[in-house]
């Protein structure tokens, strides 16, 4: 009938487009696209986009992955334009990642191209995002096609998994700031799209504080934010809740636009740079320099059981491998939250705050805390996460499921967590801690019930690990496991 409600965004990983165009070039005998330099790729893609001659034959034979990618573009060309929004490129890192989507849209016969939204996710991609976008904005044919409008998505989940929450938060802030400056330079109307999850480790947290802590001049009366399935009910489950949530967004966007936060001082930036480097090195050291760390994650958390349950809309891994890099951020965060370690939200921060607690840094930190909304919100989220951790529960999981090697890793992690809790109490003024304590009361109440579910979950995992259980027992235990997962998630609130 020609009616449509909300528009659907299309999302695909940059590697899939790269693989498709490489296959096409190989089959047509044009060039080995994979061996071209970035400059040569840009030149080739621009030339083919402007050419009236089609590049991809209608009857081209492709493998299953390439056929799926190409079929998506063909489907877009056959769908009403009013039903579709943006084309999001996940794991974007180069100008060619963006231009190849322009070319594929043209080749598929899409008359009015979907706006292209690069999603910068890893730490290095965030740090280089302004260089990529400035290079793109120099191509007038691209800029003019979209009438000087550009949407850019900031990845919170994978950058945190890649470098740790502290370093990722600072990289996200700097990336937005630089992207805003580049957009102003080229007179581009920029919309930042925040790919936040429900958990702090994936960029979650109170909306108002998050928007008011963005770099000055980057909101400009518009924003886009992802809302996770787990929070839709609590934010939009009734008319009054929906009105309140939308009102919060509108109020925060207006305030951030009309009364933006102050520019961070140079000494604040310098300290954040030092803390960020130290935090990232520490986080990656824990993950990469201990051969048993991945085994600890596999055996102590319910990660392997989560893989078998129908939770979430995407597979838990991008590829079939044992590498943490290939694990999606959602199960990574979810599994650590279940055992109450909530590791992705704080690991690496201890070392950063130890640096900030020395000498003159302590005064700079205090200044940042009182005068910089970004840093205040960052520390507020850290305090909330520390309240949700439970070291007795973590130790119980280890008693049930860990061998001596894994218990050693657990002791080191809990020691690091204890140091961070003490640092947080020493560095944050007592009146702020007392104020936060009032807001955390509901967490402590829910914790009483969550502890029981955690003890049950650890015992269920132990019984499921036995080889001599029959099929009926396994079914009963899996049902009980789902109940504990749901209950702990409800108690923790922001989990995925």
For each predicted feature, which ranges?
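Conserved radical SAM core fold
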Residues: 119-126, 155-162
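Acidic, His- and aromatic-enriched active-site or binding-groove loops in soluble protein domains
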Residues: 24-38, 110-115, 140-146, 211-229
């Amino acid at each position: 009938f020609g009616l449509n409600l909300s528009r659907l965004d299309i999302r695909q990983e940059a590697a899939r487009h790269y693989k498709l165009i490489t296959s096409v070039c190989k089959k047509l005998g044009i060039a080995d696209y994979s061996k071209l330099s970035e400059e040569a790729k840009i030149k080739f893609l621009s030339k083919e986009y402007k050419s009236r001659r089609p590049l991809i034959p209608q009857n081209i034979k492709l493998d299953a992955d390439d056929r799926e990618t190409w079929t998506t573009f063909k489907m877009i060309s056959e769908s009403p334009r009013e039903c579709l929004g943006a084309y999001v490129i996940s794991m974007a890192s180069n100008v060619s990642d963006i231009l190849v989507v322009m070319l594929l849209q043209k080749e598929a016969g899409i008359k009015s191209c979907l706006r292209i939204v690069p999603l910068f996710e890893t730490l290095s991609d965030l740090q280089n995002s302004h260089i990529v976008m400035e290079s793109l904005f120099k191509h007038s044919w691209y800029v003019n096609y979209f009438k000087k409008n550009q949407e850019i998505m900031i990845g919170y989940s994978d950058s945190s998994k890649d470098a740790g929450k502290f370093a990722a938060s600072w990289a996200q802030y700097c990336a937005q700031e630089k992207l805003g400056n580049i957009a102003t330079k080229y007179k581009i109307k920029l919309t930042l799209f925040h790919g936040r999850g429900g958990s702090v480790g994936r960029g979650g947290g109170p909306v108002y504080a998050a928007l008011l802590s963005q770099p000055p001049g980057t909101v400009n009366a518009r924003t886009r934010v992802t809302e996770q399935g787990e929070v839709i009910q609590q934010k939009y489950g009734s008319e009054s809740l929906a009105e309140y949530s939308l009102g919060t967004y509108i109020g925060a966007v207006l305030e951030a636009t009309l009364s933006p936060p102050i520019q961070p001082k140079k000494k604040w930036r310098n300290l954040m740079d030092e803390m960020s480097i130290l935090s990232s090195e520490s986080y990656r050291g824990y993950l990469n320099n201990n051969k048993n760390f991945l085994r600890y994650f596999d055996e102590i958390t319910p990660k392997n059981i989560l893989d078998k349950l129908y939770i979430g809309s995407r597979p838990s891994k991008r590829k079939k491998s044992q590498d943490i890099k290939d694990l999606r951020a959602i199960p990574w965060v979810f599994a650590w939250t279940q055992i109450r370690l909530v590791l992705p939200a704080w690991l690496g921060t201890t070392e950063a705050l130890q640096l900030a607690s020395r000498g003159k840094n302590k005064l700079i930190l205090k200044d940042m805390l009182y005068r910089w909304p970004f840093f205040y919100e960052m520390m507020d989220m850290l305090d909330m996460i520390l309240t949700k951790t439970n070291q007795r529960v973590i130790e119980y999981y280890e008693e049930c499921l860990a061998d001596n090697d894994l218990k050693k890793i657990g002791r080191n992690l809990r020691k690091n967590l204890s140091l961070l809790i003490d640092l947080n109490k020493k560095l944050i003024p007592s009146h702020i801690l007392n104020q936060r304590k009032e807001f955390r009361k509901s967490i402590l109440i829910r914790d009483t019930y969550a502890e029981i579910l955690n003890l049950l979950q650890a015992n269920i995992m132990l019984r499921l690990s036995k080889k001599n259980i029959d099929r009926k027992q396994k079914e009963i235990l899996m049902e009980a496991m789902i109940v504990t997962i749901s209950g702990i998630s409800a108690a923790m609130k922001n989990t995925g």
